[in-house]
Amino acid sequence: MPSRFTRRSFLTSSAVGTAGLLAPAWLGRMAAHAAEAGLLDRLGVALYTVRDQMKADTAGTLKAIADLGYRYIESGLEPSLGPAVKAAGLKQASVYAPTYLVTGNRAAWAGAGDLLPESYDWSKAVSEAKARGLEYLVVVYLQKAERGGIDVYKDLAARLAKAGEACKKAGLGLAYHAHAFEYEAIGGVRPIDVLLNETPKDLLGLELDTFWASIAGMDPVKMVETHAGRVPLVHLKDKAKGTPVQYDEGKVPHEAFTEIGHGEVDYAKFLPAAAKAGVKYYYVEQDYCTGSPLDSLRTSRQALANLTTGKRA
């Protein structure tokens, strides 16, 4: 791994020392470049990528992730992985909170895994996250029973704003993770626009997933630029070349998911744009891998290292 005195720290200190000599546009570019160069220090893995490996050997899988050079992991709020994560030398900044704590629709999640006790409410999730030193809670997915027309998303926006207010009071942030269906227009209006336009920016951020935005026909670069300052978290994964637009995640073929640098997402443009937009944490995720998920994670991290440092790291 690079030493602490990296190109990022050099550029940052240089920007301060020469602020009076450079035009503001140059300062902005240098700051973004410095942030991009530090991406590897804030790079993690979304554990859905290694879900089977985690079930078989939690400690071993987390150690393998750390050995690949990743620094963070993102997982569900419960059960807590804190001790195992710390033992592996990894960190957590964000976790997925149960969606039904916001929507109120527990029935939609029946059969999707163990549900938390009915006494466990959003305030409990916020308290747990705060106690663990986390920074963000993420609403990661809506079951089909939780979706609907635009009025449903307007109601969800109000619920998210309320949840975000509780997070803000606790010193946390709330982010919404969009898949593809949120980008499909309903009567000319996209649900993602409703969720973001009808919630205050300081109460709800976006966890942008480059794959799902791309497969929905969106440009991830334009998305992160449009919502600059509101995208603290991103999921990085690539979309196989020639994959058509698809809004239904259940109909996306497994082979559409591929390692970073092997698909259509333009990461050479996305990473600088994300840095400039203020993205704080980056999580590599690959829903399906043709081989070992750990091999896929190795390939994707190397691609990111090549893009951000221009050399192997």
Describe every region a protein language model picked out:
Residues 53-64, 115-128, 216-223, 267:
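Short, acidic/polar
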Residues 168-264:
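Acidic/histidine-rich catalytic cores of soluble enzymes
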